[in-house]
């Protein structure tokens, strides 16, 4: 955020005591000084591991000066009061979906949070629990929209998704074509492309009409975005 990003994406799982916590991996081994499943530890126990110990300044644009535990999602939403958040639900858990949907409402973050998941039942659970929560398209929904961009197909009457978080390519298939971007906009949703770090690629995608870039290099991405805006 200090680099000027509008927001960030975070991955969420359930702790052993049923608290949504922010961590990508299912285990602690790769990114902390602990080991074992995230789901085997309580939120308090996860807060006491060192989640910055496996990173060096050469690997990241931010290096914490002191140990940082695995935070609760509640803490992240409450701390970053102006940031737009993409919350990806990693666990295939309807319980997690309902807890996160309720938390977004409780913290008054409906206008700045988008919830996503690769698991269709999880997204369905979010939408059923709190229809007002913004969700991104599932993989299946994105595939159908990409297919509809190839032919003249009616726009869905009431799409339940508001965003598409997609890669530029999936294998040999290019996803973010001009036709796909136009199609998504016709469905009153936005296109956010991951993970793009090269400034030239970022500016090219903005020129294509995408609405957002998800990057591991927010410093470079912000400069590329600002340079693109200044040329319009």
Q: At which residue positions do the language-model features occur?
A:
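Beta/alpha (TIM)-barrel catalytic core signal, keyed to glycine-rich beta->alpha loops juxtaposed to Asp/Glu
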Residues: 117-120, 132, 137-154
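C-terminal active-site rim and adjoining tail of enzyme catalytic domains
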Residues: 146-232
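Solvent-exposed polar/charged
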Residues: 2, 6, 78-79, 128, ...
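Catalytic domains of carbohydrate-active enzymes, especially glycoside hydrolases
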Residues: 1-14, 159
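Hydrophobic packing residues within well-ordered alpha-helices of enzyme cores
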Residues: 18, 100, 123-126, 205, ...
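Active-site-proximal loop/turn and secondary-structure-junction residues that shape catalytic pockets
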Residues: 14, 91-93, 121-122, 139-141, ...
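Metal-dependent phosphodiesterase/phospholipase catalytic core, i.e.
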Residues: 24-129, 157-187
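Hydrophobic faces of well-ordered beta-strands that scaffold small-molecule active sites
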Residues: 8-10, 85-87, 113-116, 134-137, ...
């Amino acid at each position: 955020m200090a680099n000027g990003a509008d927001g960030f994406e975070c991955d969420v799982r359930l702790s052993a005591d049923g608290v949504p916590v922010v961590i990508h991996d299912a285990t602690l081994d790769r990114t902390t000084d602990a080991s074992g499943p995230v789901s085997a530890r309580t939120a308090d126990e996860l807060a006491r591991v060192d989640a910055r110990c496996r990173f060096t300044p050469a690997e990241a644009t931010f290096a914490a000066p002191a140990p940082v535990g695995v935070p609760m999602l509640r803490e992240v939403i409450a701390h970053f009061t102006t940031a737009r958040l993409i919350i990806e639900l990693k666990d295939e858990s309807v319980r997690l979906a309902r807890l996160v949907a309720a938390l977004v409402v409780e913290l008054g973050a409906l206008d700045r949070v988008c919830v996503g998941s690769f698991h269709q039942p999880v997204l369905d659970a979010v939408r059923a629990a709190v229809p007002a929560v913004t969700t991104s398209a599932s993989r299946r929904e994105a595939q159908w929209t990409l297919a509809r961009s190839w032919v003249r197909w009616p726009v869905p009457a009431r799409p339940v998704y508001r965003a598409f978080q997609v890669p530029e390519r999936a294998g040999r298939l290019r996803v973010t074509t001009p036709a796909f971007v136009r199609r998504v906009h016709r469905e009153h949703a936005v296109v956010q492309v991951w993970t793009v770090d090269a400034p030239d690629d970022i500016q090219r995608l903005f020129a294509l009409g995408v609405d957002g870039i998800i990057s591991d290099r927010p410093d470079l991405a912000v400069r590329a975005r600002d340079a693109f805006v200044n040329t319009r």
